[in-house]
Amino acid sequence: MSNAEIFAASGEGVNPIVPNIWDTALVLIGFAILLFIVIKFVVPMFEKTFAERTEAIEGGIAKAEEAQAEATAALEEYKQQLAEARAEANKIREDARAEGAQILADLKEKAASESARITEQAQVAIAAERQAAVVSLRSEVGSLATTLAGRIVGESLQDDARSNRVVDRFLADLEANSKSEGAAK
């Protein structure tokens, strides 16, 4: 037999397994008071704290989304500014190339005109020197020719006017012959 059966058979009317009614009632009243206090005071505090935390989290999420949107907008603005800066740099580079080409063309044009001017001046100087050489040679050739002719002929050709005419006519004949030979070739 079990201990409970032995205890029940002993004749006492109190069952140790079944609690006393007054104890049960007192525990139920205490539990109801505790439940009332928890529902009335503790649960609202937890609800308030939970609501504050939820609001803080949702506010943080909203702030994070707002910051993300601002960062995205700033990134787009940065990309746009970067594209504008690149376009401006390309434009400046192209302008510099065009300006360099224009400067180079101007310098080539100036060099060509300066070269033409120098060539023209050189040709004028050469023509002047040639003319001076021709005049100088005519007088020298004339005097040498008259001296030589005077020695050959045996008489003096000291008359300057006559000797100059003879020399000029001789040189003119030489030039005419050289021009006709040059045209014939």
UniProtKB/Swiss-Prot annotation:
<keyword id="KW-0813">Transport</keyword>
<dbReference type="InterPro" id="IPR050059">
    <property type="entry name" value="ATP_synthase_B_chain"/>
</dbReference>
<comment type="function">
    <text>Component of the F(0) channel, it forms part of the peripheral stalk, linking F(1) to F(0).</text>
</comment>
<dbReference type="GO" id="GO:0045259">
    <property type="term" value="C:proton-transporting ATP synthase complex"/>
</dbReference>
<keyword id="KW-0406">Ion transport</keyword>
<comment type="similarity">
    <text>Belongs to the ATPase B chain family.</text>
</comment>
<dbReference type="GO" id="GO:0046961">
    <property type="term" value="F:proton-transporting ATPase activity, rotational mechanism"/>
</dbReference>
<dbReference type="GO" id="GO:0046933">
    <property type="term" value="F:proton-transporting ATP synthase activity, rotational mechanism"/>
</dbReference>
<keyword id="KW-1003">Cell membrane</keyword>
<comment type="function">
    <text>F(1)F(0) ATP synthase produces ATP from ADP in the presence of a proton or sodium gradient. F-type ATPases consist of two structural domains, F(1) containing the extramembraneous catalytic core and F(0) containing the membrane proton channel, linked together by a central stalk and a peripheral stalk. During catalysis, ATP synthesis in the catalytic domain of F(1) is coupled via a rotary mechanism of the central stalk subunits to proton translocation.</text>
</comment>
<dbReference type="InterPro" id="IPR028987">
    <property type="entry name" value="ATP_synth_B-like_membr_sf"/>
</dbReference>
<dbReference type="InterPro" id="IPR002146">
    <property type="entry name" value="ATP_synth_b/b'su_bac/chlpt"/>
</dbReference>
<keyword id="KW-0066">ATP synthesis</keyword>
<protein>
    <recommendedName>
        <fullName>ATP synthase subunit b</fullName>
    </recommendedName>
</protein>
<keyword id="KW-1133">Transmembrane helix</keyword>
<keyword id="KW-0375">Hydrogen ion transport</keyword>
<keyword id="KW-0138">CF(0)</keyword>
<dbReference type="InterPro" id="IPR005864">
    <property type="entry name" value="ATP_synth_F0_bsu_bac"/>
</dbReference>
<comment type="subunit">
    <text>F-type ATPases have 2 components, F(1) - the catalytic core - and F(0) - the membrane proton channel. F(1) has five subunits: alpha(3), beta(3), gamma(1), delta(1), epsilon(1). F(0) has three main subunits: a(1), b(2) and c(10-14). The alpha and beta chains form an alternating ring which encloses part of the gamma chain. F(1) is attached to F(0) by a central stalk formed by the gamma and epsilon chains, while a peripheral stalk is formed by the delta and b chains.</text>
</comment>
<feature type="transmembrane region" description="Helical">
    <location>
        <begin position="26"/>
        <end position="46"/>
    </location>
</feature>
<keyword id="KW-0472">Membrane</keyword>
<dbReference type="GO" id="GO:0005886">
    <property type="term" value="C:plasma membrane"/>
</dbReference>
<keyword id="KW-0812">Transmembrane</keyword>
<dbReference type="Pfam" id="PF00430">
    <property type="entry name" value="ATP-synt_B"/>
</dbReference>
